[in-house]
Each structure stands twice: as C-alpha cells, then as structure tokens.
C-alpha cells in the first residue's frame, strides 16, 4: 500500500514555483529553506499583498500576483490553493506549462485526472498528488504521495526531496490510497488533539488548573509518541508494558475497550475516508 521514502541522494535543489501561499505552502517553503534550498530557486504566485509581504520576509523575492515564465518553466510547480479555487486558479496555467515541469498538488480531493483537464496536460505522469498533515508546519509531518507509473525516477526523487523538508514521506501504490492516508494521518492530528482535549478536561474535573491539565495531557502524548518511535516493540506491547494486572491503567484501558473505543476509532477513520471520496466526486 505504501512505502517509506529512502534517501534520494540529490545534491542540488530544483526550481520550485508555488501557486498559492497558504499555511501548507509556507510550511514547505520554510522546510526547503531550512534544508539549504536557495531562495532564488523558489517563486510564489499569491493574490494578496499581505501574503506576498510575509513571503518576502521569509526571504522569497520572486512573489507575484499572477503566473509568468518562472512558473510555466519550473522543475516543480506546487499547486497549493483551496479546492474551491481550482476552477479559477488553474486555467491561467493551461497549455502554457512546459512538458518538463512536474506538477505537485497538495489540494485535497482533486484527482490527477481533474487536474490534467484543468491544466491541459495530456501525460498524467506529469502530475503527482500528495496529502501532508498539519504537523508539517513544524517539520514533523507525514505526507502520502502518489504518482502514475509513467512518472520517472528523476521526478519522484525531486518530489521526495521537497516533501522530506516537512517530515516523513510515504509513496502510495494507488491514487485511491490518498483517501486512506487522509483518514489516518491527514485527519489524524485532530483525533489526537481531541483525545488530549478530553484527557485535559478530565484533569480539570479532578482539580488541576486548565494550564496544568493541558500540559500534562500534551507532554504525556509527546512522551508516548517518542517512546513508540524509539522502541522496537509494537504499539500493543507498549500498551501492555504499562498495563499491570489489577492496576489503575488496566482499569482505564478496560473502560475504553468496554466503551467501544477501538471500534469507534475505526468508524471515525472510515467516515473520514468516505468524505474524502465524496469530495473528489464533487470536484470532478
């Protein structure tokens, strides 16, 4: 289904143009700059003056209100507009993109086929879709990526180089897996925020201040995640390690299981997946 990305071994950065300058675009740009990408390799097209000034403050000089030759001929063109904007933001690029430009879309719900139609692209291998998540904003993201079989190794390497700047990259076997990874890691941060929010609320009910309860919940989640990353043991075994027979943790875990938490999580993830599929159909 998916494969963790391996070191791509590129020594130079491609030229990268962005259509859209929202949070995810800024996250990728920030990650690229931290990775040593020259500011001159990056250009951005955004409609608002405030966003252009923000990007200028990041060191990006090539920030414009409309696409030009840099965008049409970039090695990578990153589409980072909102789904409802594709009908107006993409047609100005139609039939002007260089055949050598690889299009990387971070737009949720818009299929490669739809993008190809909007951009006037005949080779679907020119388009790569990805689904980052919000921890990408601090370089701790997970990004699922899918490209057609005709997308060559050089293009895949450039895409990996860009996305590794914001976290871990997984290549997906099918475009349909974009819906699956949306349900797990794309929407996943909100699931953990909800659990931390609920745990914090329980702490407040026990008498802790909101500040202390929030810190306890967040640090516990962070510590558990880091332990899971560094330990060779499975998640189930790590849980068992904390759950002494007849102890306090076992009582809590049993309450979760009896309350249907595992099934509820599966149901929630499936609901996210189905909504992702629906959005793709609505935007087709």
Where are these regions (language model features)?
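Internal alpha-helical scaffold of NAD(P)-dependent oxidoreductase catalytic cores
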Residues: 14, 114-126, 142-180, 193-230
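NAD(P)+-binding Rossmann beta1-loop-alpha1 motif at the extreme N-terminus of oxidoreductases
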Residues: 1-68, 72, 204-206
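Rossmann-like NAD(P)(H) cofactor-binding subdomain of soluble oxidoreductases
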Residues: 28-29, 49, 55-58, 64-145, ...
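Small-residue helix-packing motif on alpha-helices
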Residues: 42, 52, 70, 209-216, ...
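NAD(P)-dependent Rossmann-like dehydrogenase/reductase catalytic/cofactor-binding core
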Residues: 2-5, 12, 218-284
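Catalytic, metal-anchored helix/loop core of enzyme active sites in primary metabolism
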Residues: 182-184, 196, 282
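Short pre-catalytic strand/loop immediately N-terminal to key active-site residues, enriched for Gly-Thr
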Residues: 16, 128, 177-183, 235-240
